[in-house]
């Protein structure tokens, strides 16, 4: 097949899509122009919109001996659609556009984000994912039984690997670097946020595993701005995330945060190397049961 998405459209539970050497880019790649706000929200390169099943994962991986590159300048590299489960992604290089951005461009984008958020005009909105695109992630929808392994993810403006509202996630043997430089969204390199148990399965077993990853040089260089903090943010500083906020408090190497208060699953961190990250190497925040 010519595109990875075509291969995904043909696969069934238990099947594998092999990807050979090459550079795979999103539509309109290379035609972004922040000075005119052109193509600032390009689509993902790869969308996994199917589920496997227990014992029959869908696998998206490199053909043996190959290292295909996913190159994006928009929303992200590989996204797993909401409520798609039993997925394995392995053996890719995923590269974002961070090397094409500088501090002045990112600060100007933060100013624009503030302008459209506070202009009291409902017809304007901020959607510049160019400055916050993720490498491999699950959108902001629920997932369970996902494996992300043996990938190289770098120069993503937002998180390199991220899952929200999920359970049974394994992130192992990835190399992650140069992420989060240019976003004003206070993101981190590898993130498990708002983890929640699969219905009927809220045990204290080890369910969320981050191991064997090399995570380095992931920083926030741009101050955080958001119109409203999440109710479960846990931050009581009235200036945090406002237009006038002058500090940078975020940018972790590995970050677990804001898990569901009733979530009983155990998080395992094992044999990760975290070096030269912005705030912390590993930060376990507003969650329970880590080992």
Predicted features along the sequence, with ranges:
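Right-handed parallel beta-helix
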Residues: 20, 57, 61-66, 85-96, ...
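Extracellular beta-strand-rich solenoid/capping regions of secreted or surface-exposed proteins
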Residues: 2-5, 9-13, 26-59, 68-91, ...
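Short glycine-centered segments of the SAM/dcSAM-binding site in methyltransferase folds
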Residues: 16
């Amino acid at each position: 097949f010519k595109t990875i998405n075509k291969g995904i459209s043909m696969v069934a539970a238990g099947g594998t899509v092999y990807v050979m050497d090459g550079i795979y880019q999103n539509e309109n790649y290379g035609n972004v122009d922040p000075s005119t706000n052109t193509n600032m929200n390009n689509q993902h390169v790869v969308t996994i919109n199917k589920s496997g099943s227990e014992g029959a994962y869908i696998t998206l991986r490199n053909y043996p001996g190959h290292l295909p590159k996913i190159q994006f300048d928009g929303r992200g590299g590989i996204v797993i659609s909401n409520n798609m489960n039993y997925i394995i992604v392995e053996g890719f290089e995923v590269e974002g556009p961070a090397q094409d951005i500088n501090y002045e461009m990112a600060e100007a984008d933060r100013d624009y984000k503030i302008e459209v958020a506070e202009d009291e005009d409902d017809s304007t909105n901020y959607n510049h994912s160019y400055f916050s695109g993720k490498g491999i992630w699950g959108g902001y929808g629920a997932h369970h039984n996902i494996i992300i392994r043996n990938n190289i993810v770098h120069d993503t403006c937002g998180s390199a690997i991220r899952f929200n509202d999920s359970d049974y996630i394994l992130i192992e043997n990835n190399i992650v670097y140069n992420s989060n430089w240019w976003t004003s969204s206070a993101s981190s390199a590898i993130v498990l946020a708002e983890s929640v148990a699969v219905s009927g399965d809220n045990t204290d077993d080890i369910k969320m595993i981050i191991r064997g990853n090399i995570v380095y040089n992931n920083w926030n260089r741009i101050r955080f701005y958001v119109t409203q903090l999440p109710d479960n943010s846990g931050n009581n500083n009235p200036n945090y995330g406002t237009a006038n906020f002058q500090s940078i408090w975020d940018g972790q190497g590995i970050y677990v945060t804001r898990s569901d208060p009733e979530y009983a699953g155990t998080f395992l961190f094992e044999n990760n190397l975290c070096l030269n990250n912005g705030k912390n190497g590993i930060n376990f925040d507003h969650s329970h049961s880590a080992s």
